[in-house]
């Protein structure tokens, strides 16, 4: 697995190999492990439908394989030891019975315009990939400050005083 940032001394580009399990233990399970490749994220705890499945996985590390029941899951990513969810994803694993895969955490928690956002991608031994869709949440405003206009300026419509548009700038 490739991870890191090309030219960055703190989180340099790197390749990490890992063992690969070809199949789950039975057709009712999916065997998965996690690779944490999000450079600006702390160690994470991963919850599947509110159950802790991976604990304290740090950047550049793989978890051990686990077996989960074939099902659809909501995956919550939290900083290790923190109750606040950083991101949530839909994981439709109901059709993955008997299969295995690696969930790669990739991107940036706080991306710039040219960077990719934080995402989870399931990669299977046969080369299939599935980007897990982010769970849509209601937008809420945390900081409800009032805007108070202190100055208003009238900008002239010269040379045409009959121009039907007037601009008012305030700061």
Q: Which stretches of residues belong to each language-model region?
A:
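Intrinsically disordered, low-complexity polar regions and short flexible loop motifs
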Residues: 1-138
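Glycine-centered coil/turn sites that cap beta-strands in beta-rich domains
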Residues: 140-158, 162-171
């Amino acid at each position: 697995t490739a991870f890191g940032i090309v030219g960055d001394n703190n989180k340099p580009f790197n390749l990490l190999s890992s063992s690969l399990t070809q199949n789950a233990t039975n057709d009712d399970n999916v065997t998965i492990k996690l690779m944490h490749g999000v450079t600006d994220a702390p160690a994470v705890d991963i919850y599947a439908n509110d159950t802790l499945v991976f604990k304290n996985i740090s950047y550049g590390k793989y978890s051990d394989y686990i077996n989960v029941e074939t099902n659809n899951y909501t995956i919550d990513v939290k900083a290790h030891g923190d109750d606040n969810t950083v991101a949530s994803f839909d994981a439709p694993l109901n059709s993955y019975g008997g299969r295995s895969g690696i969930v790669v955490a990739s991107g940036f928690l706080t991306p710039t315009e040219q960077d990719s956002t934080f995402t989870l991608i399931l990669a299977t031994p046969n080369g299939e990939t599935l980007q897990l869709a982010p769970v849509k949440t209601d937008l809420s405003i945390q900081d409800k400050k009032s805007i108070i206009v202190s100055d208003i300026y009238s900008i002239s419509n010269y040379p045409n005083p009959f121009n039907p548009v007037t601009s008012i700038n305030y700061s």
